[in-house]
């Protein structure tokens, strides 16, 4: 499969209302099926809402939760990514993304970088994930899943691309700065994200699929603006700011091959060099440097 139809589920989840949010997801799945979608992506914590605080434990699910499997069965025939609060066997809570395929929960990724600045307080409630790897999908393409803040840390897109990802998928609950500027054609947060994603797409020669939620929680506005960037860093599709909906676009996976042939950055990458230098830097920070040049 070289052409993939991608759907961006730019939803407005209800805070703490899992049943209502499951219904939103099921409706979007039905709509996506009617549009012959191959890859359907929902936002970070789409099943729960974002500003949960003490509601986290109430809305958390284990990865074998029947409700997740019901979603997976409903989405059979598509590769679907959903955001939820995961409860581990050790009763730790994580912000997570599940890849649903062929009626099963195929893969679960836990958010690696938890912001604790401004209005963000994620470390108070969640554990940080300790695994980052790309995953093969039924589409014949390797996906690299990450969540919101992860994309603001260089190792995440770099490692996923080194692990063979052809599509980087970032699901987000990004609140907006300068929301009043939308009517003037701008939004500070959206502009920052757009620059970030175009840069990573070019440097990794991957497609970037970014899905951000919309809606308001406790006076915090989430701006949407979900988009798809091609491996050359060009915007393939950008959803409207602040509007909910299911937005569909097509991508050609041959663009990855063509761009990597013309610009072989991954071929020329030196992970062993990076690893050696990181080991040196870690030793230096621990006061164990050996004066090696």
What are these regions (language model features)?
Residues 1-6:
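Extreme N-terminal starter segment of soluble prokaryotic enzymes
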Residues 10-16:
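Short polar catalytic/cofactor-binding loops
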Residues 18, 27-112, 174-199, 203-206:
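Cys-nucleophile CN-hydrolase/nitrilase-fold catalytic domain and related Cys-dependent amidase chemistry
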Residues 23-37, 155-164:
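Short amphipathic alpha-helices and their capping/turn segments at secondary-structure boundaries
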Residues 63-66, 88-196, 262-265:
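Active-site catalytic loop in hydrolytic enzyme cores
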Residues 63-82, 148-246:
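CN hydrolase (nitrilase-like) catalytic-core segments centered on the catalytic cysteine
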Residues 82-84, 95-99, 133, 226-228, ...:
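Short beta-strand scaffold segments in enzyme catalytic cores
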Residues 256-293:
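A conserved C-terminal secondary-structure "cap"
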């Amino acid at each position: 499969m070289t052409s993939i139809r991608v759907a961006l589920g730019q939803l407005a989840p209800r805070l703490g209302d899992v049943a209502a949010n499951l219904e939103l997801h099921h409706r979007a799945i039905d709509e996506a099926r009617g549009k012959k979608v191959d890859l359907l992506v929902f936002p970070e914590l789409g099943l729960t809402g974002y500003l949960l605080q003490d509601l986290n434990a109430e809305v958390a699910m284990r990865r074998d939760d029947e409700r997740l499997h019901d979603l997976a069965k409903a989405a059979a025939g598509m590769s679907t990514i959903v955001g939820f609060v995961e409860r581990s066997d050790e009763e730790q809570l994580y912000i997570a993304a599940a890849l649903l395929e062929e009626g099963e929960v195929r893969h679960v990724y836990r958010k690696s970088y938890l912001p604790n600045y401004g209005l963000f307080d994620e470390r108070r409630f969640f554990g940080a994930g300790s695994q980052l790897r790309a995953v093969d999908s039924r589409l014949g393409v390797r996906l690299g899943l990450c969540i919101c803040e992860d994309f603001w840390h260089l190792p995440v897109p770099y490692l996923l691309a080194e692990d063979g990802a052809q599509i980087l998928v970032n699901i987000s609950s990004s609140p907006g700065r300068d929301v009043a500027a939308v009517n003037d054609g701008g939004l500070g947060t959206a502009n920052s994200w757009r620059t970030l994603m175009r840069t990573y797409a070019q440097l990794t020669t991957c497609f970037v699929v970014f899905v951000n939620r919309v809606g308001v929680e406790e006076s915090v506005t989430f701006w949407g603006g979900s988009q798809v960037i091609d491996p050359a860093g060009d915007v393939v599709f950008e959803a409207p700011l602040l509007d909910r909906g299911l937005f569909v676009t097509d991508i050609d996976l041959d663009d990855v091959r063509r761009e990597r042939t013309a610009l072989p950055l991954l071929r020329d990458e030196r992970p062993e060099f990076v690893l050696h230098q990181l080991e040196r830097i870690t030793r230096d920070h621990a006061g164990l440097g050996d004066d090696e040049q």
